Amino acid sequence: MDGGDDGNLIIKKRFVSEAELDERRKRRQEEWEKVRKPEDPEECPEEVYDPRSLYERLQEQKDRKQQEYEEQFKFKNMVRGLDEDETNFLDEVSRQQELIEKQRREEELKELKEYRNNLKKVGISQENKKEVEKKLTVKPIETKNKFSQAKLLAGAVKHKSSESGNSVKRLKPDPEPDDKNQEPSSCKSLGNTSLSGPSIHCPSAAVCIGILPGLGAYSGSSDSESSSDSEGTINATGKIVSSIFRTNTFLEAP
């Protein structure tokens, strides 16, 4: 009995009576009156019959919701315009960055200028120092050269050659300061026994006073035909004061 009653209820639900349809139509009309606009028709439109199964209709609703969700979180929909507060904030930040950059450039230029000025000062001081060092180094070299020349001339040897064959004579320093008074006269009378008559000895026109660096008094060759003669005077410090080179010229008396 119970099983038969359940079967009858299921069969009854499959069939809808005219009264139920009228009641549903009346309910839809009431709802339509609530949402109806002036341009809409007065009567509620009939429901469109959908021959699809329940599964297909549910699947369609699910797909529709998924599309709406994806459309909401797309990248192009996430981009939006900036409002006024945000633009003001960004302008302030950019202005502060420009000020900081400007200050940094000014500091760099100032440091470069100071560095160049210091380099110029150091360069000038180094040049002055080099000039002073050059002066200090040149003076000892000159004194050293003078002493070395004096030492070299102190041991110079003079060879005197004549027809009579005189011996070698070494130069010696003269203790007397007045050396010019010892210069011989312009002409001398030589009494040479080897010559037949009296003769007059006259000096040549070339007279050398002082010395040149690196030069000493050297005698001529020991040949008996050489008739040149040189005499020098050396003071107490070993420096030649005057040197007279003569050429023996023998003139017969008239």
From Swiss-Prot:
It is found in: Nucleus. The modification N-acetylmethionine is found at M1. Residues 201-254 are annotated as: Interaction with PSME3. Its main location: nucleus. The modification N6-acetyllysine is found at K139. GO terms for cellular component: intracellular membrane-bounded organelle; nucleoplasm; nucleus. Changing S222A: Reduces phosphorylation by CK2 and interaction with PSME3. It comes from the Eukaryota. The modification Phosphoserine is found at S17, S222, S228. One of its GO terms (biological process) is negative regulation of protein binding. Keywords: Acetylation, Nucleus, Phosphoprotein. Residues 22-52, 155-195 are annotated as: Disordered. InterPro entries: FAM192A, FAM192A/Fyv6_N. Phosphorylation by CK2 stabilizes the interaction with PSME3. The keyword Transport does not apply. Residues 22-39, 171-182 have a biased composition (Basic and acidic residues). Disulfide bonds: none annotated. Residues 183-195 have a biased composition (Polar residues). Pfam families: FAM192A_Fyv6_N (PF10187). Interacts (via C-terminus) with both free and 20S proteasome-bound forms of the proteasome activator complex subunit PSME3; the interaction is direct. Promotes the association of the proteasome activator complex subunit PSME3 with the 20S proteasome and regulates its activity. Inhibits PSME3-mediated degradation of some proteasome substrates, probably by affecting their diffusion rate into the catalytic chamber of the proteasome. Also inhibits the interaction of PSME3 with COIL, inhibits accumulation of PSME3 in Cajal bodies and positively regulates the number of Cajal bodies in the nucleus. This is PSME3-interacting protein. It comes from Homo sapiens (Human).
